[in-house]
A protein has these predicted regions:
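Positively charged, low-complexity terminal tracts
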Residues: 1-74
Length: 74
């Protein structure tokens, strides 16, 4: 069975010394998930962080993110 992942959508956001990548992928099983990558320049190298949000968790993740953004923008 193949474990290949298919990229369906990608968005890149530059923010100062950081770059964020929002990638929607599809697993071999057909399940979709969001991968958020952060790349930050640290000295001469780059630091990378990643979080994966699975399709069934998107509604609650989105709700929480909207609340946080609303709080920050007050």
């Amino acid at each position: 069975m193949s474990t290949a992942k298919k990229e369906l959508f990608s968005e890149r956001v530059k923010a100062g010394s950081r770059t964020y990548f929002f990638d929607v992928k599809e697993a071999a099983t057909g399940a979709k998930y969001l991968v958020i990558n952060e790349s930050k320049k640290v000295g001469e190298s780059h630091e990378h962080n990643r979080i994966m949000i699975f399709e069934e968790d998107i509604p609650s993740f989105s709700e929480g993110l909207q609340k946080v953004v609303g709080f920050i923008q007050k």
